[in-house]
Regions:
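Glycine/charged-rich beta-loop-alpha catalytic/anionic-binding loops adjacent to active sites
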Residues: 8-19, 36-46, 103-111, 150-151, ...
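Active-site-proximal alpha-helical scaffold in enzymes
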Residues: 29-30, 34-78, 116-138, 227-249
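Condensing-enzyme catalytic core mediating Claisen C-C bond formation in acyl metabolism
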Residues: 100-177, 186
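Conserved small/polar residues in nucleotide/adenosyl-binding loops
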Residues: 252-253
Length: 253
């Protein structure tokens, strides 16, 4: 989009690419996967900012639970590091200004955090009905047993005070999974390294887990990767699966 806006300004509307619209609409990410592989089942792309990839995985799991599909491809990708993308987040004062020490700029939950570092990337997981996976001898890396989502209904960028929305989502996930808060031992936090966001998330964790919150291991992968915006949930889901596979937690936060 940014490239074509520049082209139109410099050379006129006749030079805008005919592929601009197909390239920028979000549903084409899933559309390309279906066309390349001949997948004809449910196909759509959630658009929910930093929760997009997590919603993609969660909604794909719900499709399987409802019997709509037995196998789903889900994930997210992001390519937001453009002049206009950087300028937009900078205008919101969401980015770290620790330019003199970029390697320490992304510091979730640190008292001196001052914003996030933008990143790009993507990840995809294959979700499958358990019985189908077993019947075909598939390697099962992890089981998704609970999913929850909610809305703050508060502000366009700031989380609700006290982390009410995030807490509600975690409670719903625990309820669906049939788990007590005390049965959880690790949380891969959203942890963007923003002042308001990290406070709200910390309060949400404490509200859901109570005293057990102080026994939990909590870390944010963004301390190492930066913030992958729409792809964050998929990347971090893969990190959690690998952590279980190798019995190594991401200790950075």
């Amino acid at each position: 989009l940014a490239e074509n806006i520049h082209t139109m300004a410099e050379k006129g509307p006749g030079r805008v690419s005919p592929f601009m619209v197909p390239a920028m609409i979000t549903n084409m990410a899933a559309g390309q996967v279906s066309m390349l592989n001949g997948f004809k089942g449910p196909n759509y792309c959630p658009t929910s900012a930093c929760a997009t990839a997590a919603h993609s995985i969660g909604e794909a799991a719900e499709m399987i639970r409802r019997g709509v599909a037995s196998i789903m491809v889900a994930g997210g990708s992001e390519a937001v590091i453009t002049p206009i993308g950087i300028a937009g987040f900078n205008a919101n004062k969401a980015l770290s200004t620790r330019n003199e020490s970029p390697e320490t700029a992304s510091r979730p939950f640190d008292v001196s955090r001052d914003g996030f570092v933008m990143a790009e990337g993507g990840a995809v997981v294959i979700l499958e009905d358990y019985e189908v996976a077993v019947s075909r001898g598939a390697t099962i890396y992890a089981e998704l047993i609970g999913y929850g989502l909610s809305a703050d209904a508060h502000h366009i960028t700031s989380p609700a005070p006290g982390g009410e929305g995030a807490g509600r989502a975690m409670k719903l996930a625990l309820k669906q999974a049939g788990l007590a808060p005390s049965e959880v031992n690790y949380i891969n936090a959203h942890g963007t390294s923003t002042h308001a966001g990290d406070i709200a998330e910390t309060m949400a964790i404490k509200s859901v887990f109570g005293e057990h919150a102080f026994k939990l291991a909590v870390s944010s992968s963004k301390s190492q990767l930066g913030h992958l915006i729409g792809a964050a949930g998929a990347i971090e889901a893969v990190i959690c699966v690998l952590a279980m596979q190798h019995a190594i937690l991401d200790r950075k936060s």
